[in-house]
Regions:
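Carbohydrate-interacting/catalytic domains
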Residues: 1-55, 82, 86-88, 361-364, ...
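Acidic/aromatic-lined carbohydrate-recognition and catalytic surfaces
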Residues: 2-186, 190, 203-263, 270, ...
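Generic, well-ordered alpha-helical scaffold segments in large soluble proteins
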Residues: 36, 87, 184-187, 191, ...
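Hydrophobic residues within beta-strands of alpha/beta enzymes
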Residues: 48, 196-198
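Hydrophobic "anchor" residues on beta-strands that sit immediately upstream
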Residues: 94, 98, 195, 252, ...
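Conserved alpha/beta catalytic core and glycan-binding cleft of carbohydrate-active enzymes
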Residues: 106-139, 238, 242-420, 425
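Active-site rim elements
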Residues: 168-178, 225-228, 333-346, 407-408, ...
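Short acidic (Asp/Glu) and glycine-rich catalytic loops that position anionic groups and cofactors
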Residues: 217-220, 286-288, 329-334, 439-447
């Protein structure tokens, strides 16, 4: 594997709307981010990923972009963005942005021109098709529910959208459209952006025949991702994208890639891959329901553990993946992956350790470093997320009561990760002096940055130790390039693995069970690098782990 500048970096995702509001309008902004750069740097962060800050009607929280060259005024100005770039550079941090190029907003100039002239140049920037016998051109269900086809008033045509109807899909078959996108991407890279997180990118390749699929739900429709899984050729688009943009700037790119074919991993993240890396969603996909959140399966610990470790072994043949516990589209990891008895500061530290020391690029999501958790709301109107509202309806239609449907939303809603960051115990958790756009979590007086700054044993200060160990000069090589070797897999409650190079061996071992466990050490221990129980004595023959204990040991090689 060819060494790259980003291989040993740690990333932090900011969801700007919920990070910090500087002007009291209830919406986080660029000025708020600038004011917290020292806080982010102290966490050991090298790369900051900003969720969309482009001009947008915010139907889908900025993933519906109406102008790729403008900053949403809710977040600030281009001058403030340039200041953010400059201030991050002073601190030796890199900024990457979300790149949403499968679709745009229906308010984008291109789509407005297409609607005005359905036979004109801009109509070919999108997918317009005639209906079939008064019905949509095909039976695809969008990711947010309902048909992927929206009728164009006054015509017999429909336009295609895999997400909300306000997010028409862009026609990547059109070279003019592709060049427009490449020009925009290069404009941002010229400004000094270090790269992009690329949203929903595998969806850009369509089967232009748009064939019907066997219905998979009572609505008579089929999930649109079935087309994605059955069409070939996305790699040609991705190579063209890379060569015309990212490659010229040695940019760091991380793809959001679902529905990839099993044999394509090397094409996506190898030395000559389409992207620098892609997110590893293997653990998150385990809880995908057949019809929605309401029938999400229970995932037992061993399945979760073995899935992650199997993915590690598979990926290291090709390159590095990006590892996450949570992001803006997922519920909080502490609530999702830990049993109730482990949803404590000790358990939170354990979960963070086993994730951040995996092989790959760690991505920490805002609030994860203080152990923010899911929130319980008893009214669907408290939710803002378009996907949650759709999933609530699906659950009710499937026969769940209002209480049961809300319980499902409480577990899986994207708004769990979008509640404002809890900075202190003051009103609105110190996020805003106004009315927050989304309710602040009710536990903000117990879980907040200010309280944890003062507590040397807090989750926040533990995370700082964790990132420092990963980046320490004497361990950087093993944590960056060392192989992941699973250990103690016969245990019902232990997740353990070695990180190994030719000269070093590090053991990461965690007990997710309620009871203490003991196991025989396979190698002599040289040093305790980290413990969420503050242990410093090297174990000799036996490794004893209390409930929710994690320990990181340097072993003889």
């Amino acid at each position: 594997m060819t060494e790259k500048w980003w291989h040993d970096k740690i990333a932090y995702q900011i969801y700007p709307k919920s990070f910090l509001d500087s002007n009291g309008d209830g919406i986080g902004d660029l000025r708020g981010i600038i004011s917290k750069l020292d806080y982010i740097k102290a966490l050991g962060i090298d790369i900051i990923w900003l969720s969309p800050i482009y001009k947008s009607p915010f139907v889908d929280q900025g993933y519906d972009i109406s102008d790729y060259y403008a900053i949403a005024e809710e977040f600030g100005t281009m001058e403030e963005f340039d200041e953010l770039l400059a201030e991050a550079k002073k601190r030796n941090m890199h900024i990457i942005m979300d790149l949403v190029i499968n679709h745009c907003s229906d308010k984008h100039e291109w789509f407005q021109k297409a609607l005005a002239d359905p036979d004109g140049e801009y109509a070919d920037y999108f997918y317009f098709r005639k209906g079939k016998n008064g019905n949509p051109p095909s039976n695809y269900r969008s990711y947010f529910g309902g048909s992927c086809w929206e009728s164009v008033p006054g015509t017999d045509k429909y336009y295609f959208h895999m997400f909300a109807k306000e997010q028409p899909d862009l026609n990547w078959e059109n070279p003019k459209l592709r060049q427009e996108l490449y020009n925009m991407i290069n404009w941002w890279l010229e400004k000094g952006l270090a790269g992009f997180r690329i949203d929903a990118i595998i969806n850009i390749k369509k089967d232009l025949a748009f064939p019907d699929y066997e219905p998979d739900g009572p609505d008579g429709m089929a999930a649109c991702w079935k087309m994605v899984e059955n069409v070939d050729g996305v790699g040609e688009f991705l190579e063209d994208l890379k060569k015309n943009t990212f490659q010229k700037y040695d940019a760091f790119t991380v793809g959001e890639v679902f529905n990839m074919k099993a044999d394509e991993l090397g094409q996506f993240i190898g030395d000559n891959g389409h992207f620098s890396t892609i997110f590893d969603f293997c653990a998150h996909s385990l809880s995908d329901g057949a019809h929605g959140w309401y029938d999400a399966p229970h995932v037992d610990f061993k399945t979760w553990r073995d899935t992650i470790l199997s993915s590690q072994i598979n990926v290291q043949k090709y390159g590095l993946e990006a590892n996450i516990i949570e992001n803006h589209d997922e519920p909080r990891g502490v609530s999702r992956f830990l049993p109730k008895y482990a949803q404590t500061p000790v358990g939170t530290k354990m979960l963070g350790t086993v994730n951040i020391l995996l092989r790959g690029i760690p991505f920490i999501y805002q609030g994860q470093e203080i152990g923010m958790q899911n929130e319980i709301w008893n009214d669907i109107h408290d939710y803002n997320d378009i996907s949650t509202i759709d999933q609530y309806k699906l659950a009710r239609e499937a026969g769940l009561s209002d209480t049961e449907a809300l319980e499902v939303c409480g577990k899986m809603s994207r708004d769990n990760a979008r509640t404002p960051v809890q900075w202190n115990a003051q009103a609105n958790a110190g996020f805003t002096t106004g009315t927050p756009w989304l309710k602040v979590h009710s536990d903000y007086k117990e879980i907040n940055v200010a309280a944890q700054e003062k507590d040397p044993d807090s989750v926040l200060n533990y995370y700082r130790k964790l990132t420092a160990i990963r980046k320490a000069p004497e361990y950087k090589e093993v944590f960056t390039y060392g192989k992941t070797v699973p250990a103690y897999q016969d245990s019902e409650t232990v997740m353990a693995y070695y990180r190994e190079t030719k000269s070093q061996r590090i053991l990461v071992a965690a007990n997710f069970g309620r009871e203490a466990v003991s196991t025989k050490l396979e190698y002599p221990v040289k040093k305790v690098l980290l413990s969420n129980q503050n242990r410093t004595d090297c174990p000799e023959e036996m490794l004893k782990l209390d409930s929710c204990e994690v320990i990181v040991l340097e072993c003889e090689k």
